[in-house]
Curated annotation (Swiss-Prot):
Gene name linked to the record: odd-1
Record localization: Nucleus
Family: Belongs to the Odd C2H2-type zinc-finger protein family.
One of the record's GO molecular function terms: RNA polymerase II transcription regulatory region sequence-specific DNA binding
The protein, known as: Protein odd-skipped-related 1
Protein species of origin: Caenorhabditis elegans
Length: 242
C-alpha cells in the first residue's frame, strides 16, 4: 500500500496536487524530449559531431547554432552542469527555443477565449430604412406599419361598419364597440373600456395631484380645513369660567 504524496499516518498536511498548467507543460516537454532523442539517435556519431545538413537547416530556422555555447550565468542560480557536451548544449538550446514559442492554451486563458467567441458571435444589427422619410427600424414589421402612414393603406376592414385600420390589433379593439364588450377594467373605479390605450389614459386621471388644503392660524396653533369643521361643530369652552 502506497501513501499519497507528502502524507504520513496521522498527518494533516494535504497532498500536493499539480495544477493543470503544470501537467500540460510536463506532457509537452516529454513529447519534445522523445522527438529530439529520436532525431539525434537516427544520426551517426560523425553526424552528431558535425551535424547533418538537414539538422543544420532545421536549427537555422529556429535561430540556433549547433556550435554555439550556452550563455554563462551565476553558479548559485544556474541549474546547468559546468561540464556539458555538445549534445547537451544542443538539447538545451532546442528545448529553450521551442518553449519560448509556446503560448498559453485557450483552456488556460478563458478571458481571451471568451473575447474571441464574443467577436465571432456578435453580428451587425439589421436596419430597415423608410424610403419616404429615411427613418430607421430594427424590424421589418415595424417598417411596414410605419410606411402605411405615408401611403394611407388600411388593409383591415370591419365587417359591421366598414371602417378600415392600418393594424390588426386596432381592428380587434374596434370590434369590442359593436359587441358592447369592455374587457379592460379600471382597478380603482371599476370603469370598463374597449381599448387598452384608453384605459391607460383614464388611469392618469386618478393620479392627478390634489390641491393643497387651506390652513388658518388660531392663536399660535395652525389648523387645517378638517380642523375648522370640528371647531364650527363644537364651540370652544372657556375653562377660566368653570
Amino acid at each position: 500500500m502506497t501513501l499519497p504524496w507528502n502524507t504520513f499516518p496521522g498527518s494533516t498536511v494535504p497532498p500536493v496536487v499539480p495544477s493543470v498548467e503544470d501537467i500540460i507543460r510536463m506532457l509537452v516537454a516529454g513529447q519534445q524530449k522523445i522527438a529530439i532523442q529520436n532525431l539525434l539517435q537516427s544520426q551517426s556519431k560523425e553526424q552528431v559531431n558535425g551535424t547533418s545538413h538537414d539538422l543544420q537547416n532545421w536549427l537555422t530556422s529556429l535561430c540556433i547554432s549547433p556550435s554555439s555555447s550556452p550563455t554563462p550565468s551565476n553558479a548559485s542560480t544556474s541549474t546547468i552542469p559546468a561540464q556539458m557536451t555538445n549534445e547537451n548544449v544542443l538539447h538545451l538550446q532546442i528545448q529553450s527555443q521551442l518553449f519560448s514559442n509556446l503560448g498559453t492554451p485557450w483552456f488556460l486563458n478563458p478571458e481571451q477565449h471568451n473575447k474571441t467567441n464574443n467577436a465571432i458571435r456578435k453580428r451587425p444589427k439589421k436596419e430597415f430604412i423608410c424610403k419616404y422619410c429615411a427613418r430607421h427600424f430594427t424590424k421589418s414589421y415595424n417598417l411596414m406599419i410605419h410606411e402605411r402612414t405615408h401611403t394611407n393603406e388600411r388593409p383591415f376592414h370591419c365587417e359591421t361598419c366598414g371602417k378600415s385600420f392600418r393594424r390588426q390589433d386596432h381592428l380587434r379593439d374596434h370590434k369590442y364597440i359593436h359587441a358592447k364588450e369592455k374587457p379592460h377594467k379600471c382597478e380603482i373605479c371599476g370603469k370598463g373600456f374597449c381599448q387598452l390605450r384608453t384605459l391607460n389614459v383614464h388611469r392618469s386621471c386618478h393620479h392627478v395631484q390634489e390641491p393643497i388644503s387651506e390652513t388658518f392660524m388660531l392663536g399660535a396653533i395652525k389648523f387645517g380645513k378638517a380642523d375648522s369643521l370640528l371647531i364650527d361643530a363644537e364651540p370652544l369652552i372657556d375653562v377660566t369660567t368653570i
